[in-house]
Amino acid sequence: MKYIIGYDIGGTKCAVSIGKVDDSITLLGRHEVPTTRSPEGTLAALEQQTKEWLAAYPVSSIGISCGGPLDSKKGQLYQVANLPGWDNFKIVEHLEQKFHKKAYLQNDANACALVEWKFGAGKGTQNMVFITMGTGLGSGLILDGKLYSGTNDNAGEVGHIRLAEDGPVGFGKNGSFEGFCGGNGIARLAERMGGTPGGHNQRTRRSRKIRRRLCKIGI
């Protein structure tokens, strides 16, 4: 049995969690804050909670999940589309210096795929796909019983595939998969399809129209 702290870096919020790992994972605590354009400032807001857990539990390491592109070996983020201001941030080095624990970085979809494959619905399978749908959209691939991340850790970055020329913008690219199905894209689709926010029936009708359009383009 071991205790691990996890950092989840997202475009809308960042969170730190602690869990106990044996034959399964037990979540012991979680704390989240809004994501800002300052990586140092955002992580500082999670620092006190992390220190309290480090004092209370024999934590072995820190895991970090974040949308790509990133370099898991160097522990560095690159131009992550939904994290303006975080370009080229060396997040592993930053956390290791703060907390004096070994830290590991992984693409968020890859991290989810690994956990689901080892402990969840994918347990016992040799091939599976995990799709993340949050502020952005991505996927993690398990092929032949191993994580497949590609040459540059970007094998599952399906969110930027263009599906239509005039679709909603997904972080700079019109009509991308992420533009249609990411959190921001769905909101833009709802706005495009009409009107000001209304009651439940109006939102339901709008949602049905959106689903029909997505079905037409094969989503």
Show the residue positions of the predicted features.
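Glycine/GP-enriched mid-protein hinge/lid loop-to-helix segment characteristic of carbohydrate kinases
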Residues: 17-20, 28-30, 36-42, 104-106, ...
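Anionic group-transfer/hydrolysis microenvironments
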Residues: 10, 67, 110, 134
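Short, flexible segments with low predicted structural confidence
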Residues: 66-68, 158
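Conserved phosphate-binding loops in N-terminal lobes of ATP-dependent enzymes
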Residues: 4-66, 73
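Glycine-rich phosphate-binding loop and adjoining helix at the ATP-binding site
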Residues: 40-47, 51, 60-62, 69-127
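Short glycine-aspartate micro-motif
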Residues: 2-8, 61-63, 128-132, 138-140
